[in-house]
Amino acid sequence: MENTFKLLFETIGERKRNPLPESYTNYLFSKGEDKILKKIGEECTEVIIASKNNDKEELVKEMVDVLYHCFVLLAEKNISLEDIMAEVTERNGKLSRVGDRREIDTL
């Protein structure tokens, strides 16, 4: 699984360095951060709808779209997958108990 994410992230980075005219990834990079963020917002909304509709197949598809667009944002901001994995490692085991986290309604 990690290799699949890594390959996707590397492909996105390659599109950023060497744009292909017909590439959707290139289109997002050419439009900039605002377009990428808008797409993330749209895809997150679709995740919520798929979840509320209990549509597992659609939820999986929309989650892939969210991950893809988040990877594009990371590449746009020059944040590596290794940076993300280091943060996941750092957090592993921390704030894992309910009492360790703030309540959602207080955010």
From Swiss-Prot:
Question: What reactions does this protein catalyze?
Answer: 1-(5-phospho-beta-D-ribosyl)-ATP + H2O = 1-(5-phospho-beta-D-ribosyl)-5'-AMP + diphosphate + H(+)
EC number per UniProt: 3.6.1.31
Going by the UniProt record, its keywords in alphabetical order are: Amino-acid biosynthesis, ATP-binding, Cytoplasm, Histidine biosynthesis, Hydrolase, Nucleotide-binding
An annotated Gene Ontology molecular function: ATP binding
Protein's cellular compartments: Cytoplasm
Q: Which CDD domains match?
A: NTP-PPase_HisIE_like
One GO BP annotation is: L-histidine biosynthetic process
Q: Which GO terms describe its cellular component?
A: cytoplasm
**Pathway it acts in?**
Amino-acid biosynthesis; L-histidine biosynthesis; L-histidine from 5-phospho-alpha-D-ribose 1-diphosphate: step 2/9
Family from the record: Belongs to the PRA-PH family.
Q: Which PANTHER family does the record associate with it?
A: HISTIDINE BIOSYNTHESIS BIFUNCTIONAL PROTEIN (PTHR42945), HISTIDINE BIOSYNTHESIS BIFUNCTIONAL PROTEIN HISIE (PTHR42945:SF9)
Q: Which protein, by its recorded name, is this?
A: Phosphoribosyl-ATP pyrophosphatase
Question: Gene symbol?
Answer: hisE
